[in-house]
C-alpha cells in the first residue's frame, strides 16, 4: 500500500489504498498530522509514534522573540473538552532553530512551522527568520487566530488584517497556511481574503473562545481568565467551517482540525472538504493516538474501496447536492 501506516497489515477483503495526500503543491505520505501546541516542538512524541510515518508535525507557534506566555493555571478540563490559555509561550525562532529543529529533523518528520506576532511587523520578522530552513520544513502555518493583538483581538477576525498578515509573511519562501477561527460572522470572506493575499491553504479551525469559572471562588479557572475550548465539543464546529469554506471556495485547500480523536473524525472532515487533518487535544490523553488513527484510517479506506484518499476530499458535497439537505439556511 502506497504511503501505508507503520505496522499496518491489509486485512483480508480490504482493498489496496494510496494514502498520499496533497495540500496545494506540497505532497504528504498521508493526511494525518499533529496539530500545533499539543506536542511541544515535536520530539516529545518520538518515543510514542514513528513521526516519519505521519503526514507532518506542526510545531508549537513561534515568534521572532522569546515569550513567556500566560500565568498559571493554563489548562482546565471541561465537559467534552479542555480549556487552555497557554499564551503562546516559546523560545523564539532563533533559539528553536538552534536547539529544537535539529532533533526534530532527525526523526524524519515533515515539518510545518507555526508562527505568530502581535503586529504585522512581527509576523514579517518571524517569516524572514524561516527563509533558510531545510527542505524538510515544507510549509508555514500563519497563526492568525490566537488573541495576539495588543488589544487581545485576533487578526483572523478582520479580513483586511488577516490578508495583510499573509502578505507580509511571503519572505518565509514556503507555502503559507492561514490558521483561522470560527468565531466570526463570515468565515468565507476571510478565507477569500487570505487566499487572495497569497495563502496556499487555510487551517480550520483554532480553539473556540470560552470561559470556565470556579463556583466556589467565583474566579476564572484559568490564570488568564478567558481561554480557548478544544476537544470533542468543537468537532461539529470544525466540520461546519470546513464545509462552508469548501462549498464557497472549492479550489482552496483546507487542513481540518478540531476535536479529532478517531479515524471517523478524520473521514468526516475530509468528506466536508479537508485535504489533510490535524490531531490536537486528544494527543494529551493518548500520545500514541496519531499512529492508531493512521492505521484505522487506512483500514477504513480499504474496506470502503477508497483507492486514493483524494476521492474523499469534499465528497459529501456531491451527495448533499443530490439530497439538497446540508448547506440549506439554518432554521430560525
Show where each model-derived region lies:
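N-terminal capping/small domains of soluble enzymes
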Residues: 2-111, 116-117
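Catalytic cores of alpha/beta
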Residues: 43-48, 123-133, 184-197, 247-249, ...
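Alpha-helix-loop-beta-strand connector modules within alpha/beta enzyme cores
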Residues: 91-108, 157-178, 222-254, 293-306
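Conserved, mostly hydrophobic/aromatic
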Residues: 34, 57, 96, 113, ...
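Glycine-rich phosphate-binding active-site loops on the catalytic face of alpha/beta enzymes
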Residues: 59-64, 139, 144-146, 201-211, ...
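Glycine/Thr-rich beta-alpha phosphate-binding loop at enzyme active sites
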Residues: 82, 144-160, 190-252, 288
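Alpha/beta catalytic cores of nucleotide-metabolism and tRNA/nucleoside-modifying enzymes
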Residues: 1-15, 229-252, 261-332
